[in-house]
Regions:
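Hydrophobic alpha-helical segments and their helix-loop boundaries in membrane
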Residues: 1-200
C-alpha cells in the first residue's frame, strides 16, 4: 500500500544521503583548511552533514539504488570512502609540498635546528615550512579557493560515479605522479633560497 511505498522511498532517500556523506565526510577529514588538526572533528562532521544535505539532491539521479544484500551495501559504502580519502589525500599532498620546500630552505639556511610546533600537522616542523603551510591555508580562504575544492568534490561524481568501484591501479599511478611532481615543485620553490645560501 501507500505505507510500503513511503517506507521504500524513505529508505532510498536515507541510503542516498549516507552514500554521499561517506564520500564528502571522508574527503573533508583531509582537505586543506578543513582537515587540519586544530579543526574539531565535530565541526568537520557537522559541515560534512550540512554539505551532504545540499549535494544529495544534485547528484541523486546518478546514485545506485539500495541493494538487497548487506555485503553489496558495504562494498558501495567502502567504494565511496575510498574515493573520498583519495581526493582528500591528493589535495593534502599538494599542500605538503610547501612543508617540504620549507624544510629544504631550513636545511640550507641553518634554520633546521629551529623547530616549532606545526598546528596544521600536529607535529614539530621547520619555521619556513610552517610559514608557507599556514600562509597557503590562509590564502585558500582569503581567495575563496575553498569554494573550488568543494565544487570539485561535487564534480567528482562525474569522474568517479557512485556505485562504480574506482580503478585502484589508476589511482595509485595518479598519486605517484602527483607526489613526484609535488617534490619537483617544492624543489623549485626552495631553489632561490638554496642559491642564496650557497653564495653566502
Amino acid at each position: 500500500g501507500a505505507q510500503t511505498v513511503l517506507a521504500e522511498l524513505l529508505q532510498g532517500e536515507i541510503f542516498a544521503f549516507f552514500l554521499v556523506f561517506a564520500r564528502l565526510g571522508s574527503a573533508l577529514m583531509l582537505l586543506p583548511g578543513f582537515g587540519e588538526i586544530f579543526v574539531s572533528t565535530r565541526i568537520r562532521l557537522v559541515f560534512a552533514f550540512a554539505m551532504t544535505v545540499v549535494v544529495t539532491p544534485l547528484v541523486s539521479e546518478g546514485l545506485p539504488t539500495l541493494p538487497a544484500e548487506p555485503i553489496s551495501l558495504a562494498v558501495l559504502i567502502l567504494g565511496e570512502i575510498i574515493i573520498g580519502v583519495f581526493l582528500g589525500t591528493l589535495s593534502r599532498l599538494l599542500l605538503s609540498m610547501l612543508q617540504t620546500a620549507g624544510t629544504l630552505i631550513a636545511h640550507t639556511t641553518n634554520l633546521a635546528a629551529a623547530q616549532i610546533f606545526d598546528p596544521a600537522q600536529g607535529t614539530q616542523g621547520s619555521l619556513p615550512g610552517n610559514f608557507l603551510t599556514l600562509m597557503a591555508i590562509l590564502l585558500i580562504f582569503v581567495t575563496n579557493l575553498h569554494h573550488v575544492m568543494l565544487a570539485a568534490l561535487v564534480g567528482s561524481y562525474e569522474s568517479f560515479p557512485a556505485g562504480v568501484m574506482p580503478p585502484l591501479g589508476d589511482l595509485a599511478q595518479l598519486a605517484t605522479r602527483i607526489v613526484a611532481d609535488g617534490f619537483f615543485l617544492a624543489l623549485q620553490i626552495a631553489t632561490p633560497m638554496i642559491a642564496v645560501a650557497l653564495m653566502f
